[in-house]
């Protein structure tokens, strides 16, 4: 797949699910997208303090349902921060990202709809 930015994104299933294991799985990409979105927001919000931060790392972990579809029931993003910055500022940046800026976290709560275009024709649900 290729995103709007022009970069190639390689995804694949694990061998256990019939893939070759030659790319990130879609669920790994989902967690990465969430961490990336919030991480970029937090970095931008904390921009004027970045000279005081020596490490800013984001680690994601998700718990999925046992049965299909095995969507996430809980996601934890751990922010690893080293530097001379008040923890309240970091919490505020995270809150602002989640409540106001991060389109990925907002999308995880959104109603999902589907479109099908088959051979150049958009299908309606009645087909």
Name each region found by the language model:
Residues 1-32, 43-127:
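Extended beta-strand/beta-hairpin segments
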């Amino acid at each position: 797949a290729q995103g709007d930015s022009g970069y190639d994104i390689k995804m694949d299933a694990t061998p256990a699910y019939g893939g070759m294991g030659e790319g990130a799985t879609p669920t790994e990409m989902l967690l990465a997208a969430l961490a990336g979105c919030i991480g970029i927001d937090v970095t931008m919000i904390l921009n004027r303090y970045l000279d005081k931060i020596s490490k800013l790392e984001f680690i994601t972990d998700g718990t999925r349902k046992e049965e299909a579809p095995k969507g996430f029931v809980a996601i934890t993003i751990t922010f690893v921060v080293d530097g001379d910055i008040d923890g309240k500022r970091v919490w505020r940046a995270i809150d602002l990202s989640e409540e106001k800026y991060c389109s990925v976290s907002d999308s995880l709560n959104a109603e999902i709809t589907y479109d099908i275009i088959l051979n150049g024709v958009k299908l309606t649900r009645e087909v």
